[in-house]
Regions:
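Low-complexity, polybasic segments enriched for Lys interleaved with small residues
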Residues: 2, 8-9, 13-31, 35-43, ...
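Catalytic cores of nucleotide-sugar-dependent glycosyltransferases that transfer UDP/GDP/TDP-activated
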Residues: 2-6, 11-12, 16-17, 81, ...
Length: 589
């Protein structure tokens, strides 16, 4: 599209739709739904030597005794209430907001189980997915519930809107106790959010503390989530769980809950970041789960000689495994990216697939974004994006010059995000025609380095050592390019946000970055960003220089790439359709 055509456009165009590792020796076979196997555990792989010494059962977390008699595993699957609850006395839940539903789509019911969800509690990308994907699935005629812990840190404005739905007691592992499980409900945009309440486990401020506290917490949560579905008599077709905190759900489904109503559901486990796996000693996890010895084998939960790996167990028992990009799905089957599970994932590769995340256009949209000084769309980006650039320069104390090339970086300041490469190339990047804006917090080493550069390049370098959501929006709108030079990146959302705001991404070819950014070709003009492959500072500098060369020597082609990026559909719609297809594939009838 030429500049002239772009300027005359009044409406945003309709978006376009757009040597394997050695196998483990006896990994589990998939359990068939119709079968009722006596032993739900996977076939044991070649056993590793037994633990040298047996650990003592861990101490309880000073619980307050609930009055209830011990329950068997079968009873807890359909738990009894501690006292009869009058259904008529339960207040009506908040009426769901009108949602456009594609009624022609086959209907499926899905329970999302995870440890965080925006806007209730969010520490990373998982919270965004748990919020945006269910909302999009509702449009595709899915009946969706999201099950979360009721953390004390959830803002009062949401706590006050929750409606009591009932309570029961549930035995837990080998603790010899029955634990209170309350259910509080909140409905928003057609999605039902059910919060599992137990102050003994969820009273601390931060959802993630340390493994000593988190292992019991998420053993309880995973079991309570399934027991709550039985209690509410809401049996989903699919249980879709996320990361290690909910990875025991597929294990519970095919063992302790197999003969209960919820045991009929199919399970999907999504890996958002393989680095975090929930690894602890076997006696502790046996103590808190009560799972049979048959699951603590090398093909399932057992790892090494003495440890259990909650994520590994979930991968073995889940009917399907997904991760957040196709390239990452391949990478995690290699030693470089597999975090010790590459053989296990290769063995289960027939049930593994990658589905790229999307972004929520309701939150990330330059046409309606209230944080911007001037809103803009595909049709007028060439006129109005510059105003946001000048406003960003003024806000951050940079030299106000529309001719400068502004590079943004919005990230956790850690090695995983490639900040060591960025630190190394800054002196070569700062050539008098370039400005750099950093937003984020993280390792002290990088925070101090970027503060130093801010002092060394006054008026040209801004180090915002904080996370400010509103400022992030303004950087996406005001920068010309965005750096995402990650060492590894399962999916990445910042490059998608940048493209939607007409800011060209400069990324390393890994994970979701490789799947979403096509390198610009100087000869054909194809591509939507600038990339480099090997993790080397010189290659990052080369990618930055290629972007600067196009910007300063061929603005016509630069503007075409800006418009191409804004026209690219990076919404959740495509991702949700792929998940819906997966649900239908698992539940054919």
């Amino acid at each position: 599209m030429t500049r002239k055509k772009a300027d005359s456009a009044n409406k945003k165009p309709t978006p376009k739709k757009a040597t394997p590792p050695v196998a483990e020796k006896a990994a589990p076979a998939t359990v068939k739904k119709e079968a009722a196997p006596k032993k739900a555990a996977p076939v044991e792989e070649k056993a590793a030597p037994a633990a040298a010494k047996k650990e003592a059962a861990p101490k309880k977390a000073a619980p307050v005794e609930e009055k209830a008699s011990p329950a068997t595993a079968k009873k807890e699957a359909t738990p009894k209430k501690a006292a009869p609850v009058e259904e008529k006395a339960v207040p009506a839940a908040e009426a769901p907001a009108p949602v456009e539903v594609m009624a022609h789509q086959p209907r499926r019911s899905v329970a999302f189980i995870g440890s965080e969800c925006y806007p209730f509690v969010k520490t990373g990308g998982l919270g965004d997915v748990m919020y945006a994907l269910p909302r999009e699935l509702v449009r595709l005629n899915c009946d969706v519930r999201v099950i979360l812990p009721r953390y004390a840190c959830i803002p009062k404005e949401y706590q006050d809107k929750m409606v009591y739905r009932g309570e029961f007691y549930m035995d837990l592992g080998r603790t010899g106790r029955n634990y209170y499980v309350g259910i509080m409900e909140y409905i928003h945009d057609g999605v039902v959010y059910d919060f599992i309440d137990n102050q003994e486990f969820f009273s601390t401020g931060n959802p993630y503390i340390n493994l000593v506290d988190d292992i019991p917490k998420y053993c309880f949560f995973s079991k309570a989530a399934l027991a709550a579905l039985n209690y509410m008599n809401w049996i989903p077709d699919i249980v879709h769980c996320h990361d290690w905190q909910a990875a025991l759900v597929p294990v519970f489904l095919k063992t302790l809950f197999q003969s209960s109503p919820v045991g009929k559901a199919k399970s999907i486990l999504t890996i958002h970041n393989l680095r975090f796996q929930g690894i602890y000693n076997i006696p502790t996890i046996q103590y808190w789960t009560g799972l049979p010895d048959s699951v603590f084998v090398m093909g399932a939960l057992k790892q090494g000689y003495e440890d259990a790996n909650m994520l590994k167990g979930g991968l073995a028992y889940a009917d399907r495994i997904t991760t957040v990009s196709g390239t990452y799905a391949q990478e995690i089957q290699t030693k470089e990216y597999g975090e010790g599970l590459e053989n296990h994932l290769w063995y289960h590769s027939q049930k593994l697939r990658g589905i790229v995340n999307g972004i929520d256009y309701g939150m990330w949209n330059p046409e309606t974004d209230p944080s911007l000084v001037e809103n803009y769309s595909l049709g007028n980006v060439l006129d109005h994006k510059m105003a946001n650039k000048l406003a960003l320069q003024k806000e951050l104390g940079l030299e106000e010059d529309e001719g400068k090339f502004v590079i943004g970086l919005i990230s956790r300041l850690t090695n995983q995000k490639g900040l060591d490469l960025v630190s190394a190339v800054i002196p070569q990047v700062m050539d008098g025609n370039t400005q750099v804006v950093i937003l984020g917090t993280g390792d002290r080493e990088f925070e101090d380095t970027f503060r130093y550069y801010e002092g060394a390049y006054k008026g040209q370098f801004a180090a915002c050592i904080q996370y400010d959501e509103s400022r992030a929006h303004r950087i996406y709108a005001g920068a010309d390019a965005l750096l995402v030079p990650s060492r590894f990146e399962p999916c990445g959302l910042t490059q998608l946000n940048a493209m939607h705001y007409g800011t060209l991404p400069i990324v390393r070819e890994t994970g979701g970055l490789k799947d979403t950014v096509e390198p610009y070709n100087d000869f054909t003009g194809d591509g939507n960003g600038f990339t480099f492959d090997r993790y080397e500072s010189g290659l990052l500098l080369d990618a930055i220089n290629r972007a600067k060369t196009l910007y300063f020597t061929n603005r016509y082609h630069w503007d075409e790439v800006v418009q191409r990026d804004m026209d690219k559909d990076v919404s959740w719609e495509n991702s949700a359709k792929q998940y819906k297809e997966l649900y239908l594939e698992l539940t054919q009838w």
